UniProtKB/Swiss-Prot annotation:
HAMAP family: Ribosomal_uS9_B. PROSITE patterns: RIBOSOMAL_S9. Residues 103-132 are annotated as: Disordered. The keyword Ubl conjugation does not apply. Pfam families: Ribosomal_S9. One of its GO terms (biological process) is translation. This is Small ribosomal subunit protein uS9.
Length: 132
């Protein structure tokens, strides 16, 4: 499927987080910012989001991943990593594209925090209305 020394790069984004994913053939070791996935993301929900592209394409123990992630919080980072893994998996084999696309893993989730408007307390919350 993939030669030993080749690797595939995918860049994923979610909210303000950006993840650069390097996939290479291996036995399923995932390292995020120099730490194993279990140490970096302790909650099972985030790990499931990250591993979802590999579960969908049935490539769970076939690739090692070295991931660098910048910005955002835990949810944004896990979403960015999943997006990056999906993009890198697509480069490994074009046949995986259909499975990834049908599960919405190649689509960039563009929902970001809405900016605060002048005259309002938050993006949409207005100060309390007083009649008199």
């Amino acid at each position: 499927m993939v030669e030993k020394n080749t690797y595939f790069i995918g860049v994923g984004r979610r909210k303000t987080a950006v993840a650069t994913v390097k996939l290479m053939s291996g036995n399923g070791v995932i390292v995020i910012d120099g730490k194993p996935i279990e140490e970096r993301f302790t909650r099972i929900q985030e790990r499931n989001v990250i591993l979802n592209p590999m579960m969908v394409t049935d490539t769970m123990g076939k690739f090692n991943a070295v991931i660098k992630v910048l910005g955002g919080g835990v949810t944004g980072q896990s979403g960015a990593i999943a997006h990056g893994i999906a993009r890198a998996l697509e480069k490994t084999d074009e046949k995986l594209r259909a499975a990834l696309k049908s599960n919405g893993l190649l689509t960039r989730d563009d929902r970001t925090k809405e900016r605060k408007k002048p005259g309002l307390k938050r993006a949409r919350k207005a100060p309390q209305y007083t009649k008199r």
